[in-house]
Amino acid sequence: MRYLPHSEADRAAMLATIGAASVEDLFRDVPREALDQAAFDALPDHGGEMEVERALSALAARNLTAGSVPCFLGAGSYRHHVPAAVDALIQRGEFLTSYTPYQAEVSQGTLQYLFEFQTQVALITGMEVANASMYDGATACAEAAAMAVRITRRRKVLMAGGLHPHYTATTQTLLACLGHEGEGLPPDPLALGDLIGRVGSDTACVIVQNPDFFGRLRDLSPLAEACHAAGALLVVAVCEPVSLGLVAPPGAMGADIVVAEGHALGSPTGFGGPGVGLFATREKYLRQMPGRLAGETLDESGKRGYVLTLSTREQHIRREKATSNICTNSGLIALAFTIHMTLLGEAGFTRLAWINHANAVALAEKLARVKGVKVLPETFFNEFTLRLPKPAAEVVEALAARSILAGVPVSRFLPTYPELANLLLVNATELTTPEDADALVAALKEVL
């Protein structure tokens, strides 16, 4: 294929169309030091494999890795033990792709695991039907908002203050492009009573997270009743899927759509990704659900087989009739999720959730005894918020110098809210040992 580069006129026309003054404007979100041309010019022209490996290893050694030091990071990306069998199985050549096969019925193994994935998601969320995965939790949340708009024929989406900021931003982006209204409430979470009062006749749906961004667990039943009384839908987002092994499923509390980030089961944290979006809903909304749905059937010989039952995306049907434009999806991460869940089993999943909660409670009790530290949420799963006597970012930096990954400052996600600067998100999982907790407590006493 002949290479035909864009001309200056082509580039100028494209920049004008999107409202950018220069190519550099496209990279304004990238830190300036990362775009320093002098740093690129200083790179050696070439190097042997050993030299390059040695140089990169030296750079990597400057980082603190979650597996080598006490780690309490969370805020939407949670570190759990992943059985070795998961990685071994997903690297089989038959599975090592993110694609749903175009000749779907030829790939019975892929369709079967997608069917099992859907079954697992429906069971843990307490819903009737689930799709074959979305890109990640945030995009699943955005698709849920768009789905609610289609179902209710209303244009306003209300997002609770406890919704993860990335989920809020992603949802607002999609709604703006579709010409709908997305209202994100202040991040200092409102009581459900206040949120209930905002639900009106123009509300398509209310989106809440449980446990929320700050770690709070709530009974969502009153909110669900208020939404349904107003003709709106309740969308529940779950960032930590392990919580569903212990907490009442959203479906049991009246949710109409449940979305979740599933990468904590089966995948390492990996700088927060890649993710896999879980999406479940009521059967009556099946045909408004985005993405794909794998189904079980019998062939002409009476043997069980699997098919793509629904694919209401623009590559399969007319664009104006499509429910989404999801393309290459997170099928491989969905497979990892499915294998991990299968290895755990129902009893193992529940036990894993109990261990997470117990470790978090033990950690919170120890931290609450540190002078100047207050544990904010009264009810939580495996993550909670600390109010510190000084900016959380400073504390995190000081503890990193002591080889402790203390948690995530809320200000990292919400920098425009100075009243939240002293809040620190702290997470504990089955990998958190009593020694890790003691190390964090001792270090906090030193730096506060």
UniProtKB/Swiss-Prot annotation:
GO terms for biological process, alphabetical: glycine decarboxylation via glycine cleavage system; nucleoside metabolic process
GO molecular function, one term: glycine dehydrogenase (decarboxylating) activity
Catalytic activity line of the entry: N(6)-[(R)-lipoyl]-L-lysyl-[glycine-cleavage complex H protein] + glycine + H(+) = N(6)-[(R)-S(8)-aminomethyldihydrolipoyl]-L-lysyl-[glycine-cleavage complex H protein] + CO2
Pfam families, per database record: GDC-P
Name assigned to this protein: Probable glycine dehydrogenase (decarboxylating) subunit 1
Known role: The glycine cleavage system catalyzes the degradation of glycine. The P protein binds the alpha-amino group of glycine through its pyridoxal phosphate cofactor; CO(2) is released and the remaining methylamine moiety is then transferred to the lipoamide cofactor of the H protein.
Native source organism of the sequence: Rhodospirillum rubrum (strain ATCC 11170 / ATH 1.1.1 / DSM 467 / LMG 4362 / NCIMB 8255 / S1)
Subunit structure, interactors included: The glycine cleavage system is composed of four proteins: P, T, L and H. In this organism, the P 'protein' is a heterodimer of two subunits.
Domain of life: Bacteria
The enzyme's E.C. designation: 1.4.4.2
Keyword vocabulary terms for this entry: Oxidoreductase
Lineage: Bacteria, Pseudomonadati, Pseudomonadota, Alphaproteobacteria, Rhodospirillales
